[in-house]
Amino acid sequence: MKQYLDLCKRIVDEGEWVNNARTNKKCLTVINADLVYDVGNNQFPLVTTRKSFWKSAIAEILGYLRGYQNAADFRALGTKTWDANANENQAWLDNPNRKGPDDMGLIYGALGRAFPKPDGGHVDLLQQIVDDLSNGIDNRGEILTFYHPGAFDLGCLRPCMYEHHFSLLGDTLYLNSTQRSCDVPLGLNFNMVQVYVLLALMAQITGHKPGKAYHKIVNAHIYEDQLEPMRDVQLAREPFASPKLIINPKIKTLKDIETWVTLDDFSVEDYQHHDAIKYPFAV
């Protein structure tokens, strides 16, 4: 929690104003932030200075792992995070590649589970990684990427957290996640949960102990209409102790994640938090 608040304060104190063309808003911005989550010791990085809807964050990462590309599928899992970008993003609404209401296109897990090959085929990057790690293999390239510049026009939004690199040391699994852009007040509390859960789940289904997850953010920003509640409300609150995340130990395989896992398979213990803060969302 401290590293999250330190980043928020750093942006408020040291950030520079940048005009964002996509949203037509100004952002208070810093470059480069590195966060670390101790998954092995169950130090769950859930924000306590406001209520965080952790179930929605987990539903979103589950949707990525399943390769979903329709906002309705994400809603069925338990999150509405893609409703706006699928249905209110004017550039996507005007894109001839959009297939209709709720279509998100080729983004995130939909790309990672079927990464295009030059010969017209596809590679399931996630399945390859799971197969390798399950057999104790780390080829120094166990990378799940969602970033393909040639496919940007096929989706409603470029991936923000675009790469997850898994590494084995002995029987301990580590994760390095890279994020090109981060809406810190709204997005980071979700992204921290997702990086943590991704390592915890991947370690569990490949038979390894989870180690630490390293989360690099390149462009970290606070939108102009988010600055006041962040500076005057959230940063003025004292954080509570970190809660614990419990994952159903019956989740054993990638197929389990793809077929029957729901939010009921996750629970959080001892989550004490301040009141929610409604931050504006930039589409």
Curated annotation (Swiss-Prot):
It catalyses: dUMP + (6R)-5,10-methylene-5,6,7,8-tetrahydrofolate = 7,8-dihydrofolate + dTMP. (6R)-5,10-methylene-5,6,7,8-tetrahydrofolate binds at residues 183, 282. GO terms for molecular function: thymidylate synthase activity. It is found in: Cytoplasm. HAMAP family: Thymidy_synth_bact (MF_00008). Belongs to the thymidylate synthase family. Bacterial-type ThyA subfamily. Catalyzes the reductive methylation of 2'-deoxyuridine-5'-monophosphate (dUMP) to 2'-deoxythymidine-5'-monophosphate (dTMP) while utilizing 5,10-methylenetetrahydrofolate (mTHF) as the methyl donor and reductant in the reaction, yielding dihydrofolate (DHF) as a by-product. This enzymatic reaction provides an intracellular de novo source of dTMP, an essential precursor for DNA biosynthesis. This is Thymidylate synthase. It comes from Shewanella frigidimarina (strain NCIMB 400). The gene is thyA.
